[in-house]
Amino acid sequence: MLFPVCLLSVPSVRAQTKEPASTSAEELHGGIEIGAKGIKSVAVRIVGDERGYSVNILNADILNTTIVQTKNGKFTPEAIRDTGSVTQRFYQRLRQDYRIPPEQIHIVGSSGLIGDNSQDLAEEVRKRTGQEMTFLDVETEAQLRIAGSIPRRYRIGATWYDNRGVAVLIDIGSGDTKGGYQLLRRVAGGAPEYDYITWGIPKGTVTFTNEISKAAGETADYQTFAKRAQALSPESVRAILRNEVARKPGLINRKRIYLSGGIVWTMMTLIRPEDRSTFTPVTADDITNFYNRAITNPEALLNPDLSRIRNKALRQEAEREVESVRNTFTPKNLIAGAEILRAVAGEMRLAGKQIYYARYGYLAWILSYVRLQAEK
């Protein structure tokens, strides 16, 4: 079982600085996450003190790749080569710009990587970096995401309350959908501990897009694609979600919901671009609104009117993020992801609950992983 960790909120991944030469090399750590839709790289400084550990993010980079592309169940040679090249570039930057020792850089593959030839990808990474690549299973990745995405406490007035005992994480990725919660366990003669209850289904925004395209045809128009998504969802998405809920009642009994993942980021960027808070409130109506717009006119949804944002700096930041969305997801990805999001909202009964978008949840598990390695 993984030990709970508490990560600091990321103020801005654009605030990137090189670490001064006086920093001890033992404090510098790096992580490279290879996921279904892209690669993330983080450089962090981890310092131990009497309260535990503090984490300072020095740099965070993200670049989309084609690794999710498969042929006959295998990653294509082009996808492997592309991913290896980006990984090498990120690795060299961690070594040269941030002077992180090679033994303190960890290259990790997401559970959303679905291909029968993962060893070919690992060999490409090893050839380009000299580093071994670790692959996570769904349960371990979900544990890391929970620890990194859900704040340990919340406050009402002047009183603090335990948050992880009443909250659940839902992460809709490109390759799968997963999450979970922590369950308090009393220990005789000692302090209470948390167990992780995790869940996951092999359906994500891109994998479901591929499934719909196979059924509807690669050249299907958006209306046909949306109808096929609606037809596939009951058995392909909702049925397996319902099975997870039946086995893990905490998924519907908890009242505080934290959402993360690419399609959630896309939704919040497109329907509420001016809100930059770390934990942004979301409603079930927001999800319904996003879904209806995605299935009726996804291209219009990808081009929101940002002129209403009066603050120039905020508007420019929103413009950059909207452009990132357009570079990451196609209109058909929007339709598929919105269908999964609607299924999650229905099967997990999100209406009436306190829902939050964890803005920096996309960095959660790689930061948690790096920190756990540093604590060994």
Regions found by a protein language model. Give the residues of each.
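Bacterial N-terminal signal peptides
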Residues: 1-9
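An exposure/low-complexity boundary signal
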Residues: 9-11, 103
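Boundary at the C-terminal end of the N-terminal hydrophobic targeting segment
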Residues: 13-17
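Short linear motifs in intrinsically disordered
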Residues: 18-20, 228
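Gly/Thr-rich phosphate-binding beta-strand-loop-beta motif of the actin/hexokinase/Hsp70
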Residues: 21-55, 156-194, 262
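Conserved phosphate-binding loops in N-terminal lobes of ATP-dependent enzymes
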Residues: 25-132
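Helical "lid/coupling" subdomains associated with nucleotide-phosphate turnover
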Residues: 70-98, 115-117, 121-165, 188-191, ...
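Glycine-rich beta-strand-to-loop/alpha-helix junction loops that act as flexible
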Residues: 109-113, 172-177, 257-264
